[in-house]
Swiss-Prot record:
E.C. numbers: 5.3.1.6
Top-level taxonomy: Bacteria, Pseudomonadati, Pseudomonadota, Betaproteobacteria, Burkholderiales
Family: Belongs to the ribose 5-phosphate isomerase family.
Entry coiled-coil feature ranges: none
Catalytic residues of the enzyme: 103
Keyword Transferase: no
Natural source organism: Herminiimonas arsenicoxydans
Pathway entry: Carbohydrate degradation; pentose phosphate pathway; D-ribose 5-phosphate from D-ribulose 5-phosphate (non-oxidative stage): step 1/1
PANTHER family the record matches: RIBOSE-5-PHOSPHATE ISOMERASE
Gene label: rpiA
Keyword Isomerase: yes
Name of protein: Ribose-5-phosphate isomerase A
Keywords, alphabetical: Isomerase
Job of this protein: Catalyzes the reversible conversion of ribose-5-phosphate to ribulose 5-phosphate.
Catalysed transformations (reactions): aldehydo-D-ribose 5-phosphate = D-ribulose 5-phosphate
Residues the record lists as binding substrate: 28-31, 81-84, 94-97, 121
Length: 223
């Protein structure tokens, strides 16, 4: 199977976690896009979705799926999203698509987090993928120095030669060179830096289930 075929397979498998008649949380990224396309096929079975980014909201709407503001609901049965890296314990790095803050907010409301990814995303140790940190623009340099003090190499994420601006009007610093032994501890440590909006470590609220695409089919992990 190609990488896209693996993503397609896990997107299909994730449909079984969709509760009929409810509002579900939907993530951002290439694998989440495959899931949205599958969700469009059963849109009449759900009430709608909460999107973790403007891009996801637009894709959901293009399929005729109602998009709800998170402030309109109290709870969701499930949040379905991809990951840039995931461990066998369900800790993840997310934020390659620059939607980490909204992803973390929506995931916090869901009773269950289902991660969908191709099998290459399963790792023994997080950190080979650069760790995204969303920051208030005026604090960019201050935060970068503190991230460097943690042993990483911070780089401001650019788009067309200018700082990428998130849906929240913030910047992203990608931290290279980290080998993350204790994801939950590092998540708390970085989140405590003044000027950080959030870090793309999902360890304190990690995945409950992972659907991983492999050459042999979809592998399911429960945490």
């Amino acid at each position: 199977m190609t990488q896209d075929e693996m993503k397609q397979a896990v997107a299909r498998a994730a449909i079984e976690y969709v509760v009929p008649g409810e509002i579900i949380g939907v993530g951002t990224g290439s694998t989440a896009n495959f899931f949205i396309d599958e969700l469009g096929k059963i849109k009449d079975r759900i009430k709608g979705a909460v999107a973790s980014s403007e891009a996801t909201a637009q894709r959901l709407k293009s399929h005729g799926i109602a998009v709800f503001d998170l402030n309109e609901i109290d709870a969701m049965s499930v949040y379905i999203d991809g990951a840039d890296e995931i461990t066998a314990q369900g800790a993840m790095i997310k934020g390659g698509g620059a939607a980490l803050t909204r992803e973390k907010i929506v995931a916090s409301v869901a009773k269950q987090f289902v991660c969908i990814a191709d099998g290459s995303k399963l790792v023994d140790l997080l950190g080979n993928f650069p760790l995204p940190v969303e920051v208030i623009p005026m604090a960019q340099a201050v935060v970068a120095r503190k991230l460097a003090a943690l042993g990483g190499e911070p780089r401001l994420r650019l788009k067309d030669g200018k700082p990428l601006v998130t849906d929240n009007g913030c910047f992203i610093i990608d931290v290279l060179g980290l080998k993350i032994q204790d994801p939950a501890e590092l998540e708390a440590q970085i989140n405590n830096i003044v000027g950080v909006v959030t870090v793309g470590l999902f360890a304190r609220r990690g995945a409950d289930i992972a659907l991983l695409g492999t050459a042999e089919g979809v592998k399911r992990l429960t945490f």
